[in-house]
Amino acid sequence: MSAPQDISQNKALLWFMAAACGLCAGANYYSQPLIHSIQQYFAVTESKAALTVTFAQVSYALGLLFIVPIGDVANKTKFIPLLMTLCAMGLFLSAFSVNLPMLWVGTVLVGLFSVAAQVLIPLATMTVQPEKTGEVVGFLMSGLLVGILLSTSLAGLFSNLFHWKVIYVLSGVLMLILAYALKSRLPYVMRMKMDYGQIFVSMAQLLKQEKRLLLRALAGGFAFAAVSILYSTIALLLSSAHHLPDLVIGMVSLVGIFGALSTQYIGR
């Protein structure tokens, strides 16, 4: 079988992939500035409404652990659009939820299947020249991080202008459009010749052998946890104590957008 095409020269495809990374990752963060609106809409306590954020992050972590490895043994060209389609279904379920448990189910589906971004990025590394890997990964990571930061701002904006559910509808539609666009554009790469269980064994061996990788993974995990704790709880403080609208709460995340944009240059 011929080698996969080098996508580093296909700027249109790279932009599609970066947009998909941003949309998938950002889908987990729409609820953060909307906790107060969710609380009022479903007439529940603040703590119950805040569980939406918890379910989003826990399901995302489970998706990273158990669904992303499937991408190593599956046909990524078909698997990525499938994940994005399932994620869109979760977004639509959240948008048309009539009670809080229904929103939670939609949130869990989004969290589990939004990990398409973490399958897209390894695919990119397999389809570029080694000297271009850092640049391409940096570009896709910029898309992912900008998507996370913009997601809360846009969620707050649409909540103020229309309704808090609007962002879920729009995101679901865009997700389906991007899934369809990528389905016919993603290059095929060879699957790994190991079964699903062997992947977990290899990951454990890798962490045991590569201490530096383990340390960097822990550092990244703790750093991201700190940021998540800040943005998850600040919404409660700003809405209840300071009575700020969803728009202002969502705008807080824009502080980090410059750091996100710099990742593509760091990759070079």
Please state what every model-predicted region is.
Residues S2-I7, L186-A217:
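Juxtamembrane intracellular "pre-TM" segments in multi-pass secondary transporters
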Residues F16-E46, L64-I67, A117, L230-A235:
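Extracytoplasmic
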Residues A43, N75, F96-P101, H243:
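Helix-breaking motifs and short loop linkers at transmembrane-helix boundaries and internal kinks
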Residues L62-V98:
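Conserved MFS/SLC helix-loop-helix module at the cytosolic interface between two early adjacent transmembrane helices
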Residues T107-S142:
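Cytoplasmic helix-loop-helix junction between adjacent transmembrane helices
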Residues G172-R191:
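C-terminal membrane-cytosol helix-exit motif in multi-pass small-molecule transporters
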